[in-house]
Amino acid sequence: MPTLEHLTRSPRKKIKRKTKSPALKGCPQKRAICMRVYTTTPKKPNSALRKVTRVRLSSGLEVTAYIPGIGHNLQEHSVVLIRGGRVKDLPGVKYHVIRGCLDAASVKNRKNARSKYGVKKPKPK
């Protein structure tokens, strides 16, 4: 236990918390332009072709973002909205594209977990 004399000489250090999505700079989302849309393979033991895009944020930074859902309409120069959230089996991918917003179309024929993929409520029959 430090004495008052100890604390006057050197005060307690504040714990600096490191953000998990530094490119967003404290914002919930950021607008970005697709530079390159491609597929990449996950690390072991998983196997797939994950759809990702290299984007330039409105702040000028370039990051890699994951495109969730089945099928997408993104191509070079598409304007998308980026949120935080890493993809566990893709190293270096710390951001997600928000579907159903700006140029990223929502997922077709989606019935469950619709809000995550920008799908409107279907009309009841």
Curated annotation (Swiss-Prot):
Residues 1-23 are annotated as: Disordered. Signal peptide: none annotated. Part of the 30S ribosomal subunit. Residues 9-20 have a biased composition (Basic residues). Its main location: plastid. Keywords: Chloroplast, Plastid, Ribonucleoprotein, Ribosomal protein, RNA-binding, rRNA-binding. Pfam families: Ribosom_S12_S23. GO terms for cellular component: chloroplast; small ribosomal subunit. The keyword 4Fe-4S does not apply. The lineage of its organism: Eukaryota, Discoba, Euglenozoa, Euglenida, Spirocuta. The gene is rps12. GO terms for molecular function: rRNA binding; structural constituent of ribosome. This is Small ribosomal subunit protein uS12c. With S4 and S5 plays an important role in translational accuracy. Located at the interface of the 30S and 50S subunits. The keyword Ribonucleoprotein applies. GO terms for biological process: translation. It is found in: Plastid, Chloroplast. CDD domains: Ribosomal_S12.
